Structures are given as structure tokens and as C-alpha cells.
From Swiss-Prot:
Residues 186-188 form a propeptide. This is GTPase KRas. It is found in: Cell membrane; Cytoplasm, Cytosol. It comes from Monodelphis domestica. GTP binds at residues 10-18, 29-35, 59-60, 116-119. Alternates between an inactive form bound to GDP and an active form bound to GTP. Activated by a guanine nucleotide-exchange factor (GEF) and inactivated by a GTPase-activating protein (GAP). Interaction with SOS1 promotes exchange of bound GDP to GTP. The keyword Acetylation applies. It is a lipid-anchor. One of its GO terms (cellular component) is cytoplasm.
Amino acid sequence: MTEYKLVVVGAGGVGKSALTIQLIQNHFVDEYDPTIEDSYRKQVVIDGETCLLDILDTAGQEEYSAMRDQYMRTGEGFLCVFAINNTKSFEDIHHYREQIKRVKDSEDVPMVLVGNKCDLPSRTVDTKQAQDLARSYGIPFIETSAKTRQGGDDAFYTLVREIRKHKEKMSKDGKKKKKKSKTKCIIM
């Protein structure tokens, strides 16, 4: 069974834990209890493949930012979460993405942009803004509501699909490099 290491990142209070707990335990947590770091595991079937999701729910608070490099190193894919009623959390996505790319030493890291709390009427981040940002990053965008379950499972499953695509691409690139190296070998 394939295991996928997913990391949920974003500013404090955007609903990272609520989304994760909704996926794992099928219930909505409405009280805010800042996370330091929680780990969850769940076996699911995605596109006919049984897999194990190893989900790291991270701290959004700035005082825990020193821990970020460590969990970014181990993650295979990242849900970058902002709240649709919090413009600052949307602006912070850029910093999380840059840090992930720096730590992974790669421009190509599986990510999904997630606009959470779409059940709330007090939207300050327009859907089009988020779609444009995701398009500029070359990643999918999904609006979610941990409260109503809208899009939550889809966000995690889409991230797994992004990781699969990334692994496929990397293995194809690896095979191309191996083939190329065979043709360049000259013995004198």
C-alpha cells in the first residue's frame, strides 16, 4: 500500500485542523484551539488505489515558524490553506510556497491551493483572485468548507493525484537520463 506524506500549511485560524479532522473523523470542530503539530493517518481508496494518508497538521502561528523547515523536508505534498474571509492569510500563501520550494530545493513541488470557509458570507478573497494565483503557480485550486464538508475530501485527494503525477514525471525523467547516459559512453 502506498503511503503519502501530506502537510497542511497556512496562517493561524484558517481551518487547517478543522479540514483535517473532518476528513479523518467526519465531524466539524468549531472551537479554535491553536495547533502546535498534530499527525493523522487514514486509509482511503483514491482512483481505485488503496493508500495510506499520513497527514501533518501544522502550526499557523508565527511563534512556531522555526519548526516549518523540518516538516517541509519530510512532506511529499502540501495543502496551502487560506480563509476566504481573511485577505492576509491569502497573501501569506506566497511566503509558505517560497519556503516550501527553498526547503525542498525544487521549483516543482506538489501543492494544492485551498480557499477554506466558503460557507461564510463575509468573503474578502475573490474566487477569481485565488484561481489566478493557482494558475500562476501551476497548481489546482479548491474551495472548501470544513463545516459543510464541501470540497474537503477533494482537496486531499487532489493533492494525492498531484503527488502521483509528480512521481510519474520524476521516474520518466530518470529513465530519460539513464538512456542518455548509455548513449554517451565511449570506451577508448
